[in-house]
Amino acid sequence: LLFPLATLQLNADQPVERNAENIQDLNPDKRFIFMPVPRRRGPYGSVHRRRGPYRRHGNCFCPSG
């Protein structure tokens, strides 16, 4: 599948709208969105919690059995 190179080129004459300019218009309390930190998961997914008969292997707790 081939495309002409003209379709892939950017037009340098058009100004690019920057997000930083748009962010300055917002309320300072609404500038940042809360993103929770992903937690590490072991080979058993979210089973790695200290509930039930679990055995410690390094930094994780695996089901004993």
From Swiss-Prot:
<comment type="subunit">
    <text>Homodimer; disulfide-linked.</text>
</comment>
<dbReference type="GO" id="GO:0005576">
    <property type="term" value="C:extracellular region"/>
</dbReference>
<comment type="similarity">
    <text>Belongs to the conotoxin M superfamily.</text>
</comment>
<feature type="signal peptide">
    <location>
        <begin position="1"/>
        <end position="12"/>
    </location>
</feature>
<protein>
    <recommendedName>
        <fullName>Conopeptide Vt3.2</fullName>
    </recommendedName>
</protein>
<feature type="modified residue" description="Serine amide">
    <location>
        <position position="64"/>
    </location>
</feature>
<keyword id="KW-0027">Amidation</keyword>
<keyword id="KW-0165">Cleavage on pair of basic residues</keyword>
<dbReference type="GO" id="GO:0090729">
    <property type="term" value="F:toxin activity"/>
</dbReference>
<keyword id="KW-0964">Secreted</keyword>
<keyword id="KW-1015">Disulfide bond</keyword>
<keyword id="KW-0800">Toxin</keyword>
<feature type="propeptide">
    <location>
        <begin position="13"/>
        <end position="48"/>
    </location>
</feature>
<keyword id="KW-0732">Signal</keyword>
